Amino acid sequence: MALEQIDYEYQSGFGNSFESEAIKGTLPKGRNAPQNCPLDLYAEQLSGNAFTAPRHTQQRSWLYRIRPSVCHTPLKPIDSGLVCDLNNLHVDPNQLRWKPFPITEDKPHDFVEGLITIAGAGHASVRHGLAIHIYTATKSMENKSFYNSDGDFLIVPQQGTLDIQTEFGFMKVKSGEICVIQRGITFSVNVEGPTRGYICEVFGSHFKLPDLGPIGANGLANPRDFLSPVAAYEKKEGIEHTKINKFLGKLFSATQTYSPFNVVAWHGNYCPYKYDLSLFCVVNSVSFDHLDPSIFTVLTAPTNEVGVAAADFVIFPPRWLVQENTFRPPYFHRNCMSEFMGLIRGVYEAKKEGFLPGGGSLHSCMTPHGPDSDTFYAAIKAELKPTKIPDVALAFMFESSLILGISDYAKKNFIDDDYWKCWQGLKDNSKI
């Protein structure tokens, strides 16, 4: 069956404590680890936080599986490909833009083989920082799975649909949707045809919904629209299954004789989820001025400093612009934060040329940026009538309080060397 025809069942809500059974009666009642689990399953806890973390931040799940995860051969180092550990990044304060990262169809590769680190800061070993990756894939992961010891993946498909099998069940994630797969969760990705997208990986805190403050109880990304899988297991024995682990930026491999997707039931609040970006309820000025992009925050991964994020996931979705006496495109800016932008589809409102779907840009801490010359001069002459950012346009930003370096691959490949020229048409227009 084609991926577009597949539809899965989900549970609704963000951060909920769920329970799910693929076979009725397989969840123990009133306890987590009975002497003998129903149907003689194994009980296994997956912890997303320290045991002593404050209760309101505590994330963990109990999984009831046919065989425990520990049954595998020793993990051995393998070629990490274009995934890097952030120890030897290039420093470049310039405005950077990348042309679309190609999908090499002449070299069939799966999701893990197509991971490419672009930028990052901090390190997984100290549980602080983030990494930004591109992924491409032309084939599915057959008898192969992946889990990440370093951090949580926020995955943004740009081209193609991901059919993701996890220990917790299945998710179908298409372009225009996102998913989060947290540290330690085993998953496998199936694709049909050329596939590409972006990943923001956070090493410290987990993603959460931003506080709404004076906005109130509703708006932006609503909790009910986040979907988590329901239990779905497969009993495969006597096979050769390869499990890949990312550990401190390096890849390791082990084999096992059974499918890791053998969880018959589970309960808890540490589980993957997906979200449809078209459900984002936009808040904006209906009088004057261009408000700050924080109003478009979908998810945030906070640092220990209140109000400061290791990573914010921000989108620039279809919406109405109605401000009076206002320069409506994004303003010229020097930011204490780092801004990595990508384009899912369409045209970004501040860059009419050169910023393409599947590419990206990085504006680092205090590096000036803003609308290009053509956008600026068009905006200051435009009739200020209500205008719709079209439905075909969808850009996003990974914003971080950390100063990002770029990988060797990103430094040497697909850089738009002429990016700086898009501002050179901005002249002295003053009447002084």
UniProtKB/Swiss-Prot annotation:
Residue positions binding Fe cation: 333, 339, 369
Similarity remark: Belongs to the homogentisate dioxygenase family.
Enzyme class per UniProt: oxidoreductase
EC number: 1.13.11.5
GO biological process: L-phenylalanine catabolic process; tyrosine catabolic process
MF-aspect GO terms: homogentisate 1,2-dioxygenase activity; metal ion binding
One family name in Pfam for this protein: HgmA_N
Superkingdom as given in the UniProt entry: Eukaryota
Keyword NADP assigned: no
Organism the protein comes from: Dictyostelium discoideum
Cofactor: Fe cation
Reaction catalysis annotation: homogentisate + O2 = 4-maleylacetoacetate + H(+)
UniProt protein name: Homogentisate 1,2-dioxygenase
Recorded name of the encoding gene: hgd
Keyword Oxidoreductase set for record: yes
